[in-house]
Amino acid sequence: MMEFLKDFQKMGIYLAYNVNVDAIVYLNEKHIESLIKEFGAENIKKRIDEYPREINEPLDFVARLIHALKTGKPQAVPLVSYEADKWFNSRFKYDFERIGGQVGVIANLLANLDFNKVIAYSPLLGRKQAEMFVNRDNLLYPVVENGKLVLKKPLEAYREDDPVKINRIFEFRAGTKFKLGDETIEVPYSGRFIVACRFEDFARIETSPELKPYLPEIGEMVDGAILSGYQGLRRYYSDGKDANYYLRKAKEDIKLLKKKKDIKIHVEFASIQDRELRKKVIYNIFPLVDSVGMDEAEIAHILSVLGYRELSDRIFTYNRIEDAVLGAKILLDELNLEILQVHTIYYLMYITHNDNPLTEEELTKSLEVGTTLAAARAFLGDIKRPEDVKVGLNIPFNEKGEYVKLRFEEAKAKMRTREYKIVIIPTRLVRNPVSTVGLGDTISAGAFASYLSLLKRKE
């Protein structure tokens, strides 16, 4: 692990597109009981059955929150109503606020790990967001001045009039108990429920026209790029533009980043509720990039779009490793990826083709970087310096580790894997995490960065 930290000091990464502020509430029994009393158990149960896919009113939020607590699975649901947005501000006192969005989380992480250069871009950069980036010389925001590309600290580059996106995050703990009518519910796993702000101002995934011509120059400065935020896209916009317009722009960005130097590009995929939008992102973006990261639920969502409904349903219903491996093989081949990274509560997986220059042992080391960083973040709440990583090394692999390895070996024996390199490792699991927000992003960033460093060693 520590040898990777030395490599990171010589590496540069470009990040785009989504930065926001996370307003975090640590849920307890009183919060939950108060919401149930306010909205009524029967009303909540009825709305849970309707399963709203976006939050138009507070009852939609309460229903989806209770559903997340019952399953213990992390969920994110888009907030689309300005009235509901005001209700959250009047109803909840936030425990604290910090930078969010994949770009925000990953930028601060990599800067604190002493990467040589972290270039973080978001189409909007308000003052509050700029203040939440760590104030370090290696974390920079690209601007154009006098016809030249200039890299500035975010605090020197923000725009006073840019709106700030706020996501509300409700952290819940395993073992929390509450009553919903006659039903007693105990939360099975720690996790978080995200109310993801999806207003139109924040749904434009693009590089500014001024900066766009300089993307090839940025590509030359870095070893790789991590792109995210596509989950914010809308089908249609009030000015007549649509998702296809922004996806065309996003494809241009990828090609420009690779124009002068064929850098590796990773996409961190987040849940897209709208099936048609999900399909558009998958078919437009994935074939142009090298690496994609996701969890097993997102594998199932994508398989459904690709026409593998039965396998998708099996992953949702049974959560078996063998189904996840089969699904990952399909995604790797159908979407022309170099490598697919899967992160779940109990295991991490890489799948790539047999001609990948890295050995299975090296791929395993890369995944271990991801889970070690995530464990350190879960235990400490944040990683503020390279030495914090040692905390993660002292956290044991989860108790299902041996079972995970056994099921993986059984899965490999049953299916054709000769053309692939597939590695799975158990996760290091913190029993009472300070926070679960950003752990998937931390895993993906750590794994992708270490993957790049291992490839560089082969050059």
Curated annotation (Swiss-Prot):
Q: Which GO terms describe its molecular function?
A: ADP-specific phosphofructokinase activity; magnesium ion binding; phosphofructokinase activity
Question: Which segments constitute the ADPK domain?
Answer: 1-457
Q: Which terms does the UniProt entry file under GO BP?
A: fructose metabolic process; glycolytic process
What is this organism's lineage?
A: Archaea, Methanobacteriati, Methanobacteriota, Thermococci, Thermococcales
This chain belongs to which protein, by name? ADP-specific phosphofructokinase
Transferase as a keyword? Answer: yes
**Function text:** Catalyzes the phosphorylation of fructose 6-phosphate to fructose 1,6-bisphosphate using ADP as the phosphate donor.
Q: Which UniProt keywords apply?
A: Cytoplasm, Glycolysis, Kinase, Magnesium, Metal-binding, Transferase
| Pathway stated in the Swiss-Prot or TrEMBL entry | Carbohydrate degradation; glycolysis
Instruction: Quote the cofactor binding remark.
Output: Binds 1 Mg(2+) ion per subunit.
PROSITE patterns from the entry? ADPK
List of residues binding Mg(2+): 268, 298, 441
- Record-stated family: Belongs to the carbohydrate kinase PfkC family.
Q: What gene is it encoded by?
A: pfkC
